Regions:
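Non-catalytic cap/lid and distal C-terminal segments of serine-dependent acyl enzymes
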Residues: 1-179
């Protein structure tokens, strides 16, 4: 799994171009291994900020992925930006304007654009532990999917925002990918 630090899988205002980096990895992996580039053969998953990256790529690179599994995802990226981080500044991602609502960093904005542009959104498996601090954000996002009549599968179970939950969730996601 690629390391994107605390970039939010974004091209940072003051830092690296991690969104482009992930796209480069996608292309590189398909060049060096005998892998299909057909949409139906490619899937994406991630947990926490990686779940945010998963939904971001599912909505902006939907031609590449048939299925996407955001696990314990940060769907309200503004919450991530507003946290008081000890080891980085959100402005490294956003620049001087830390209000990301309605920007390319906002998953709701990306979803609205995808719907407006009639994008074929990948099939979604959204998973989150019921004790996860992001659980309500996940519920709010699926309500938004319901309003837009976008199909998805939602699975919740006992679990917190930790690797004990994600280990089970990624196994389930892999099973779902090959169904």
């Amino acid at each position: 799994m690629p390391n994107v630090n605390h970039s939010g899988y974004s091209n940072m205002a003051y830092g690296h171009s991690y969104y482009d980096y992930i796209l480069e990895i996608y292309e590189y992996v398909h060049q060096i291994f005998p892998l299909s580039k057909n949409r139906e053969d490619n899937f994406i998953a991630g947990h926490s900020m990686g779940g945010y990256g998963t939904i971001k790529f599912a909505l902006t690179q939907s031609d590449k992925f048939a299925k996407a599994a955001p696990l314990s995802a940060v769907f309200q990226a503004q919450h991530f930006i507003d946290l008081d981080w000890i080891d980085f500044s959100a402005q490294s991602i956003t620049g001087e304007n830390t209000n990301i609502n309605g920007t390319e960093l906002d998953t709701y904005h990306l979803l609205n654009k995808a719907v407006e542009n009639q994008v074929e959104i990948p099939k979604l498996l959204i998973m989150c532990g019921k004790e996860d601090f992001l659980y309500e954000d996940n519920i709010e996002f699926i309500r938004n999917l319901d309003e837009k009549k976008i199909p998805y599968t939602f699975e919740d179970s006992s679990g917190e925002h930790n690797y004990a939950y994600w280990d089970k969730a990624i196994k389930r996601a892999i099973e779902w990918f090959v169904e």
